Amino acid sequence: MPEGPEVRIMSNFIKKNTEHKLFKKMFDVHKENTEYENPIITDFYVYSQSSGKLLTLSFFNDDNHIDIDFFMGMSGNWCWVPTDEWSNVKFTRFRIDSEDDMSLVLYGGYLGPKYKIGGFDTKRGPDPTKEFDKFKLNIVDNLDKKVFQLPIYEALLNQEYFSGVGNYIRSTILYYLDESPFQKAKDVIIKRPEIIDMCRDIQITSYKLNGGQLKDWKNPNDSNSDDFLKWVFYQKGNHLKDSDNRTFWYDPKWESFRK
């Protein structure tokens, strides 16, 4: 958490506030307010884009261009505040200051956000909400890989194949698919290929319902979450700890299929 829909919401929030604005400085607040000195420190613009759970910000001017990848962890989020008030934001990690005295601030507490200049060296598949054909092909062409021998509830968190799918997205997909989550992933995909479409559609629905405001993450636009909470399958039914010690929620009718 945040998952694909939340990262997309944050990316759009950043675009809304930073588009066409000139920024003066960039700070690594997490490291005692250290100001970045290279390659961009003054007079730059910002462009935001998301792919699955990954958020990439591009900082550029006529002379320089730098990309920074942000992984939001369990609690990462952004806010847009007057520069003279940024220190009121708890657990700040990173900020940029605009020439009109506003600041974009990254914050997050427990298991919070990470970022890296130049990008993380990770294997992440295509985002199903943006590149669905590539997303589908990446799954279908690799069904003999070891990951697809795992139970479907485990395999769905693999970002190399199921980009953007996290804890609540997987439980919601499997609830509405109405199949035992304890079957091998390959078997489920062959039997019910619509699960591939649902990896896209469930994320799009969540995005339209303002994202998963479930615990530590809140929509930066202060949007209502009532409809989302009625729709999502999370903290409902039975649960177990998966191999990564994350809580998976499932329909109680599948309990007898659990090994």
Language-model segments: residues:
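Residue-level signal for secondary-structure boundary elements
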Residues: 19-22, 152, 164, 207-211
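Short secondary-structure boundary micro-motifs
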Residues: 30-32, 38-42, 78-81, 117, ...
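Preference for short coil/turn "hinge" residues that link or interrupt alpha-helices
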Residues: 34, 149, 158, 207-210
